[in-house]
């Protein structure tokens, strides 16, 4: 198996642990910034492009500040994430609030911050109107149902997911929201998680671009942005090739030129809500080996545990280990 090279050396870690005892997480700020800039470059063809970092991926204010300096907004899905983003200085359309089964106080706080609200369900229109008010800019989440495939590979099953509105519901929602005074609409969808494929975003884009054209014709609304959400992933094992964000951006551009431009919708902004792609390659959990155990298998005990990295314990996720010593 090919080697994965950490962004820190043994000598650097030896110096760091003198001040910060293990276990701890360490991040490559230079790598994070370069990746954010490369993402912006990949979508530079779209005048309104913006990345809304998925705060749930790493709810760390220092990380949020770095990404804010690189021109990113934030994607929040809870009150805590909204509060953290507020404290970090994100305001207005720098915040995208996407949640489901949303409590009244979360909608109220999102409106207080003038965040862009992404409605998950058609019934939330009346609820939002009751507990707060209907803003002039709003987004609705779409679920196409069925199975989402790339070629012969099934990527995920949107029909089994609780998120989003059906095709009929989103059209009805747009009409109702237009009557309630909404002037600018957005469309959002999330169909697959951690895809290691350059085709996911372009295929999703085609679906949403065609939907946008249809909804504009049916409802007469102004669609200002289309949010591709997250789903662009990273390879966890060293033998897999990472996604090429430049190829992905070009694929979305081609779909944009093919579908939206002929429909007179070339001014639509493209948004993304990447989390894992933005940070996962640039963070390490540093832990120290402290015990050996020899029974039916050989074990090396470390000073980190599930509370430091929960994914392997919860569902057997693979995380590559590099021994620096």
Map each language-model feature to its residues.
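Short glycine/threonine-rich loop-to-helix capping motif typified by GTGT followed
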Residues: 197-204, 235-248, 279-291
